[in-house]
Regions:
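P-loop (Walker A) phosphate-binding loop of NTP-binding proteins
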Residues: 49
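Conserved P-loop NTPase "ATPase switch" module shared by AAA+ and STAND
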Residues: 154-171
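Structural recognition of the conserved hydrophobic beta-strand(s) that form the central parallel beta-sheet
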Residues: 160-162, 191-196
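A short helix-turn-beta junction within AAA+ P-loop NTPase domains corresponding to the substrate/partner-engaging
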Residues: 208-229
Length: 524
């Protein structure tokens, strides 16, 4: 079974990412000479916020320590109570003893039994340290000496106890693990490396154990506390890209194009990927949902722009309330800006704030620079819903569908296509909006103009006079570079064909009356 396929978990699937921490880890390990560890126990705290890379840092340490240490990975958050924490910890220590270390194995087991018995009967804790429970039994201190003697003989590798996600624990369990580090398992030649969120630990100790000076308490536990070094912002983008490429099975060309589009969102206005995805865990979580949604929309429609989709999904992930508003009540945030060469209704964001979400909204919903691509952008009413449904909504006619009809060579194909759409239930509004807002390839292609008028003449029976005016008004058909005589010839032929049918003559006449306009003198 290939665990690299499918969704991404917090664990690192391959070698730990090169993020500039290896040298730092080497310097840290240099502070731990073995001759010093033979004399004392050492506890190192790795402090960082949720998702900041603590697990990756621990893995980097483990990789460098595997050869020279007896590495133990202890997950206390899998235990249900403090007795299980103690039992599981010492069981892991015993597993790291050699087969010929039977006396050490036995001493660890006895030590564990006394510790557990002392926890059940607290009154005997002190006596257990100095007095045997029977003539044949050893004291806690004597067993500790025996264990330390066995694990510090010449050539013995130190124990390296790795504890990740200490901040998963609640009050009693957390306190028990800290006591384990500081007192119960405070053996010479043992190194504890513990990852945690300091703020969380302090709050839990304060609330559950009434430890008011929790920071000082933590300082007594850990001899050295490391705050993770800063890494380059691009590192998180690389994590996101690697996981997205893996989950979505993108090829090299697709991956390069996706990264280029992501970077286009963040090359101006001071926007950064880390404004939306601030840490490693979030980068992987975003990759999971983005890859899923990207595969879904790619499978169902071509009527979207990938760069816009990335922006909408970033809002979805980092600002879910804003995304919810865009999905269900868009006009709270946006306004409809009618006009422009395409006559399309563009959704525009006019907020002036400089938060990351405001900057991204302005990049997605702007009012200028209309192109042939505009009808597929999120700011276009024609395609807006696609970005939230991950498909073409029911009864909608896709931009690509309409475009293919506008560039068809055969007029019968155009007429048949429009009539198929007209027979679709509840498709009138979608078809009307396509006619009203179509960009017309800049009015420079005679075939596109011909097909548009041909299709409109088929659709005209369903239109009111006002609808005809809204579609045709402010369209300027004649421009430089167009063969006017050829255009006139083809359009006259289309009108003659429709008139010959003898139906809807008044509407055709209304269309003709609105049709011929030259560019106004001040048009640029």
């Amino acid at each position: 079974v290939d665990d690299r396929k499918g969704y991404c978990m917090d664990g690192v699937y391959s070698e730990p990412r090169q993020i500039g921490w290896d040298n730092y880890v080497s310097d840290l390990l240099a502070l731990m000479p073995h001759y010093r560890l033979m004399k004392e126990s050492l506890a190192i705290g790795i402090s960082g916020n949720w998702g900041s890379g603590k697990t990756s840092f621990l893995k980097s340490m483990q990789k460098q320590m595997n050869a020279d240490y007896r590495v133990v990975t202890f997950n206390p958050w899998t235990c249900t109570d403090k007795e299980q924490i103690i039992s599981q910890f010492f069981a892991l220590m015993r597993e790291q003893t050699e087969n010929n270390e039977e006396s050490l194995h036995e001493a660890i087991q006895k030590y564990q039994d006394i510790v557990l018995d002392a926890d059940i009967h607290p009154a005997i804790t002190f006596l257990a340290k100095i007095l045997p429970l029977s003539k044949k039994e050893e004291t806690l201190d004597s067993l500790k000496d025996k264990i330390e003697e066995a694990i510090t003989i010449d050539g013995s590798k130190p124990f390296a106890i790795f504890i990740d996600d200490l901040d998963r624990l609640e009050g009693n369990e957390l306190f028990e693990v800290l006591r384990l580090i500081r007192i119960t398992a405070n053996f010479r030649n043992v190194v504890f490396v513990v990852a945690y969120d300091r703020d969380y630990i302090c709050n839990v100790l304060n609330e559950s154990k009434n430890i008011k000076r929790a920071e000082e308490y933590i300082q007594k536990i850990f001899h050295l506390e490391v705050s993770l070094p800063k890494f380059e912002d691009d590192t998180l983008l690389d994590v996101f890209m690697d996981e997205t490429v893996r989950i979505a099975s993108l090829n090299e060309r697709q991956a390069a194009r996706l990264q280029q589009l992501v970077m286009q969102l963040f090359n101006v206005d001071g926007l950064s990927f880390t404004d939306f995805v601030p840490n490693f865990r979030q980068a992987r979580r975003f990759a999971n949902v983005f890859a899923l949604n990207l595969k879904s929309i790619l499978a169902h429609t071509k009527d979207f722009v990938v760069k816009d989709f990335i922006g909408v999904e970033l809002l979805h992930f980092a600002y879910p309330e804003i995304h919810r508003t865009l999905m269900y009540k868009p006009m709270i945030l946006l306004k409809l800006n009618k006009g422009g060469l395409s006559k399309s209704g563009l959704l525009v964001y006019e907020g002036k704030d400089n938060t990351p979400s405001d900057k991204l909204l302005r990049k997605l919903f702007y009012s200028n620079n209309e192109t042939q691509l505009t009808s597929r952008e999120v700011r276009s009413q024609l395609s807006y819903a696609n970005y939230f449904c991950y498909r073409l909504p029911n009864n909608s006619i896709g931009v690509t569908e309409f475009e293919m009809l506008m560039i068809a060579d055969d007029l019968d194909v155009v007429r048949d296509g429009v009539n198929v759409w007209m027979r679709r239930k509840d498709s009138f509004d979608s078809l009307y909006e396509h006619f009203r807002s179509y960009y017309m390839h800049g009015y420079k292609d005679i075939k596109v103009i011909r097909n548009y008028i041909c299709a409109l003449l088929e659709f005209i029976p369903q239109l009111s006079d006002k609808g005809i005016e809204q579609i045709i008004s402010d369209r300027y058909w004649i421009r430089g570079g167009v063969d006017v005589d050829e255009l006139r010839k083809q359009l006259i032929s289309l009108f003659e064909y429709s008139i010959s049918k003898g139906k809807f003559l008044e509407k055709i006449n209304h269309l003709l009356a609105s049709f011929y306009n030259a560019y106004p003198d001040d048009y640029e």
